[in-house]
Design a protein with these regions (language model features):
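Non-ligating segments of multi-cofactor redox enzymes
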Residues: 11, 18, 49-50, 54, ...
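Helix-start (N-cap) detector for alpha-helical repeat units in TPR-like alpha-solenoids
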Residues: 457, 514-516, 548-552, 585-586, ...
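Membrane-interface segments at or immediately adjacent to transmembrane helices
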Residues: 452-525, 530-536, 540-543, 569
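Short coil turns that delineate tetratricopeptide repeat
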Residues: 511-512, 546-548, 582, 616, ...
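Register position in tetratricopeptide repeats
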Residues: 527, 563, 597-598, 631, ...
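Hydrophobic/aromatic packing residues within the alpha-helices of TPR/SEL1-like helical repeat arrays
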Residues: 496, 503-504, 538, 574, ...
Length: 691
């Protein structure tokens, strides 16, 4: 007959095992069992009973603070978990830190909402505290709150690691919330581990923040100085100017929050798409403040199981005595759940000072051939969706491309593997695709197909834009008369045909309207002689635009209406343009022409005077004022404006000819003939040009 023993051990929360064995007792020794149960009920001890041989084996195998799972099922009596140390069903206690971090992240979200509400009510506020605003500083010299925040965050990361990411990022909060919801329905996100795609965030960061300055450095004709003149933009009245519209922001948050987490694992966007994390990851390698380990660690793995940053904590602390993965966002869950208090945060040597020669071996989700295929798919997907329809921002495109890469590689395996699963669903079994597999395949085809369609549309948008950029005729000359055809070069005619073809294909087969491409198509229509169609397209574009883009579409619409003789409609369109951008001086110049043609000459002169007061070097406006004053018999004022015009008019035959045509259209014939004559003096070939 087997001898039974009763043993009392402390809970894992005590980080120490009591190996006291009670005196031998028979299986039916109710007195001993009752005494042991009383001790166990106190919450300080766990009671295990069973054959003595099993307990001896268990005693050898159980590590300090970690309960052997085999013995749990051999008659273990588990007392209630203590309130100050809750335990989950899997034996890992809940993190105390997670609630504090959740509270901080919720507070960050509330601050963002309050920031927006304050701007809506007051009309002015602190500029967005968003790292992407740093691009405005580096390219235009605008010192804003986003630049200051990003700079301080990088400096803090250099010392303390990626605490800003783990405790202050609103996108990370969304991802953690989505991961929490998935776990609530029994789906634990599994990390997708890639060797190459982890470098995407750094590449994106260099593209956003370094490439523009590098391009100016290596380009002799780059736009502006290498280091711009810095100006104060800490306060703004257009808070949402650099953000996508709400209809775009919603799918952006869905893709970068839920979709990336579902397919790529917890914090999937941070790992494979976030450009700010590219810089934070580099800074983290230099940070001396890290998660470290003492000799009390017994490799139980609770830390890794709890980590939401997909860090193999138990392996890293074993190999390096600290966490060196730059993906660690210092959520501190691993420290909180460690049953032995073996993990702590403290100062010491940084990760960059650790030799990796004897380090851990990582398991990846894909093979090297699949890595190369995935990198190609990612690049193609990114180029396909970024900026398509003029809607998709860079960060959203990065998230979309990451998911496309995963789906492509998973589909490749689905079609080749005999056994494949995703979460708890079997995609293939015994070489046959299961129902879940067909569902996954259908979604993958839809997602990748949408990506391919976006790539087709984006190609035509890109080629149409290239043709637009190659147009050589100046706007002033093209708009000097209703039909610009006589002034078009053979290259311009070729580019007009190419541009029209590509933009029309993108428009006809696209799912959404690209208002920017529509404006360019309108310009092609005008140059090809269809001014009425151009006006219609500009009206459609303006309905879907805001700010400067809307102002420009309305300006060109009003200008073309002036050439068509529809002056009242032109004036209305130009007033709408000025309502969007009061500093659009060319719109004031054109509005003056509308008023002049409507017979409201004094109003026209007042508008032109307002324009030259804003910019005294406007050659055409000064010429218009000179002609207007002279036509009304005010020769002194007219001569003054004419002299000012002569000082700012380029002595180029083409420009003089353009001025002559504009003045002649307004009935200012004497001044017009002066410029025609000067153009012929500079180039006798202009005698054959139509006036």
């Amino acid at each position: 007959m087997a001898v039974w023993k009763i043993r009392i051990v402390c809970f894992p929360q005590k980080w120490k095992q009591f190996l006291n064995l009670l005196p031998n007792a028979s299986q039916k020794s109710s007195a001993s069992l009752r005494l042991a149960n009383q001790w166990a009920a106190s919450g300080k001890f766990a009671l295990h009973y069973g054959p003595a041989a099993l307990l001896r084996e268990r005693e050898k195998s159980v590590k300090s603070g970690c309960e052997d799972r085999r013995a749990k099922n051999q008659g273990s009596i588990q007392p209630p978990a203590r309130k100050n140390s809750p335990a989950q069903k899997n034996g890992i206690r809940k993190s105390k830190t997670s609630r504090w971090r959740a509270a901080v992240l919720i507070f960050v979200q509330l601050c963002m909402v309050a920031h927006i509400i304050q701007w809506r009510f007051m009309g002015k506020t602190i500029s967005p505290i968003e790292p992407s605003e740093t691009m405005q500083t580096l390219q235009g010299g605008a010192i804003n709150a986003g630049f200051i925040f990003f700079a301080v965050a990088i400096l803090a990361t250099l010392i303390f690691g990626r605490f800003v990411c783990g405790w202050g990022c609103h996108i990370l909060a969304l991802q953690d919330f989505c991961a929490w919801m998935l776990k609530k329905i029994g789906l634990t996100p599994k990390p997708f581990r890639s060797r190459l795609l982890v470098y995407v965030p750094l590449g994106a960061a260099l593209y956003m923040f370094v490439w523009p300055t590098a391009a100016r450095f290596f380009s002799s004709s780059g736009p502006g100085p290498l280091i711009p003149k810095f100006t104060n933009h800490l306060v703004t009245n257009n808070f949402w100017q650099t953000f996508p519209s709400v209809p775009v922001a919603i799918p952006f948050l869905i893709i970068c929050g839920f979709v990336t987490v579902y397919f790529l694992g917890s914090k999937g966007f941070c790992t494979y798409a976030c450009p700010y994390g590219g810089f934070f990851g580099l800074a983290d390698k230099l940070a001396p403040f890290r998660i470290r380990v003492t000799d009390a660690c017994n490799q139980c793995g609770h830390c890794t199981a709890t980590c939401t940053s997909n860090v193999l904590v138990h392996a890293e602390v074993k190999a390096y005595k600290m966490v060196v993965d730059p993906g660690c966002m210092k959520c501190m869950d691993c420290v909180s759940v460690c049953p032995n208090d073996a993990l702590y945060v403290g100062f010491g040597k940084p990760a960059i000072a650790v030799s990796k020669s004897s380090g851990k071996t990582r398991n990846y989700s894909v093979t090297w051939p699949e890595e190369i295929l995935g990198a190609a798919v990612f690049l193609g997907s990114l180029l396909s969706v970024r900026g398509v329809y003029g809607l998709v921002p860079f960060l959203m495109a990065l998230g979309y491309a990451s998911v496309t890469t995963f789906l492509t590689l998973k589909t490749w395996r689905l079609l080749r593997a005999s056994e494949l699963s995703f979460y708890r669903f079997n995609l293939t079994s015994s070489g046959r695709i299961q129902k879940a597999g067909w569902g996954f395949l259908g979604f993958s085809i839809f997602w990748v197909g949408l990506n391919a369609h976006s790539g087709w549309v984006r190609y035509h948008e890109f080629e149409g834009d290239r043709a637009f950029q190659r147009i050589q005729i100046p706007d002033e000359l093209a708009l000097a008369q209703t039909n610009p055809d006589p002034w078009l070069s053979p290259i311009d005619r070729e580019n007009i045909l190419e541009g029209e073809k590509h933009f029309q294909r993108a428009s006809n087969f696209g799912l959404f309207m690209n208002s920017e491409a529509l404006s360019k198509l309108a310009w092609f229509e005008y140059l090809s002689g269809d001014a009425e169609q151009s006006v219609e397209l500009l009206s459609q574009a303006a309905e879907h635009q805001k700010g400067q883009a809307r102002a420009l579409s309305l300006y060109y619409r009003g200008t073309i209406l002036n050439r068509l003789g529809r002056y009242e409609q032109a004036r209305t369109s130009l007033d709408e343009a000025l309502a969007q951008r009061g500093d659009l001086i060319l719109a004031r110049q054109e509005k003056g022409e509308s008023l002049w043609q409507l017979g409201r000459k004094e109003e026209a002169i007042a508008v032109w005077i307002d324009a030259v007061q804003r910019n005294a070097s406007l050659a055409l406006t000064n010429n218009l004022l000179a002609g207007a004053e002279q036509s009304l018999g005010r020769f002194v004022e007219g001569t003054a404006h004419e002299n000012q015009a002569d000082q700012s008019t380029p002595d180029v035959p083409l420009y003089h000819w353009m001025l002559g045509m504009r003045l002649k259209a307004l009935g200012m014939n004497e001044l017009a003939e002066k410029h025609f004559h000067r153009a012929i003096q500079l180039d006798p070939g202009y005698q054959e040009r139509p006036k």
